[in-house]
């Protein structure tokens, strides 16, 4: 079954598709696709004769209907152009009583709506010196607007829009550890272990921490601080006796440095000196070794000085 309304065009559009046979148009019968030529099909012949003698008629030398036709087309298509260059015909409000008025025509669509009292001025009619507000609208690009320009809406300035400089960089800093307070019993036990070995092993450190009720990190930090304190005292003693601090640190040439306390060394030397004081021939093995080394050093130094003298003389 075929639907007749779909196949056959309705009778309403027949006038738009072909002109009526009884219509005698004064215009030349050449094919044209202008809006005016399409709209004048439904106009009566009396209206066409009236429009032929409009005030915008051209001089006698030219065709009398070409210019008004173009003027009407410009009035219907772009009213702003005719207002700028001057109207070709007196401006009359379009009303629904006009027989040629079409509700959905080009003039009705392009005409300004009656609800808007004032139409926005075009960009061409604005003088460049009359800008009192920024030219760019907020909807154009919100990042172009600066905080120095007045804005009708609350726009956040550009420096505050970026949050990445305020983000935390890297890992968060760990808080400062509280200083551990050791009791006298804990301090004595730690000092006793330090006198046995300056560098405590990890298993012994864990055992000592469990025995004293401390954390492994607390025992580790205590030994580090105690070794630094001991090295400082050892350095002062070595510097006073002509040594250097590197003697207390393990190196390739000296992987096992002398880690005995300087105070104990000095006390042992004093005890040996006091014990050997009554006899003139009593010498401690350490003193004998030191004397032999001193004599060998002086002998070598004298030989070196003599060789230098010989070299300089020759």
Curated annotation (Swiss-Prot):
Residues 175-234 bind DNA. It is found in: Nucleus. Residues 234-279, 292-314 are annotated as: Disordered. One of its GO terms (cellular component) is nucleus. GO terms for biological process: cell differentiation in spinal cord; regulation of transcription by RNA polymerase II. Residues 305-314 have a biased composition (Acidic residues). Keywords: Developmental protein, DNA-binding, Homeobox, Nucleus. The keyword Lyase does not apply. GO terms for molecular function: DNA binding; DNA-binding transcription factor activity, RNA polymerase II-specific. CDD domains: homeodomain. Disulfide bonds: none annotated. Residues 258-267 have a biased composition (Basic and acidic residues). It comes from the Eukaryota. InterPro entries: H2.0_Homeobox_NeuralPatt, HD, HD_metazoa, Homeobox_CS, Homeodomain-like_sf, HTH_motif. Pfam families: Homeodomain (PF00046). Belongs to the H2.0 homeobox family. This is Homeobox protein DBX1-A.
């Amino acid at each position: 079954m075929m639907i007749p309304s779909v196949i056959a065009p309705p009778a309403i559009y027949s006038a738009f598709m072909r002109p009526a046979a009884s219509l005698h148009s004064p215009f030349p019968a050449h094919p044209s696709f202008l809006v005016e030529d399409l709209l004048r099909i439904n106009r009566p012949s009396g209206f066409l004769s009236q429009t032929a003698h409009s005030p915008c008629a051209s001089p006698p030398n030219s065709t009398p209907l070409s210019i008004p036709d173009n003027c009407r087309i410009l009035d219907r298509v772009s009213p702003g152009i005719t207002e700028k260059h001057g109207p070709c015909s007196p401006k009359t409000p379009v009303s629904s009583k006009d027989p040629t008025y079409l509700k959905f025509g080009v003039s009705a669509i392009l005409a300004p709506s009656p609800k808007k009292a004032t139409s926005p001025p075009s960009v061409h009619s604005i003088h460049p010196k009359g800008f009192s507000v920024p030219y760019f609208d907020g909807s154009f690009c919100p990042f172009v607007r600066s905080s120095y320009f007045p804005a009708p809406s609350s726009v956040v300035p550009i420096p505050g829009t970026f949050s990445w400089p305020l983000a935390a960089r890297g890992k968060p800093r760990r808080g400062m550890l509280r200083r551990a307070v050791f009791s006298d019993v804990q301090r004595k036990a730690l000092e006793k272990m330090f006198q046995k070995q300056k560098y405590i092993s990890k298993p012994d450190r864990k055992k000592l921490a469990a025995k004293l009720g401390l954390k492994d990190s607390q025992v580790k930090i205590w030994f580090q601080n105690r070794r630094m304190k001991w090295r400082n005292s050892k350095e002062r003693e070595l510097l006073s006796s002509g040594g250097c601090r590197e003697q207390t640190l393990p190196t390739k040439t000296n992987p096992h440095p002398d880690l005995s306390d300087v105070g104990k060394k000095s006390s042992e030397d004093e005890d040996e000196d006091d014990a050997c004081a009554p006899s003139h021939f009593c010498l401690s093995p350490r003193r004998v070794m030191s004397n032999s080394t001193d004599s060998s050093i002086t002998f070598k130094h004298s030989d070196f000085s003599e060789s230098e003298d010989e070299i300089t003389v020759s």
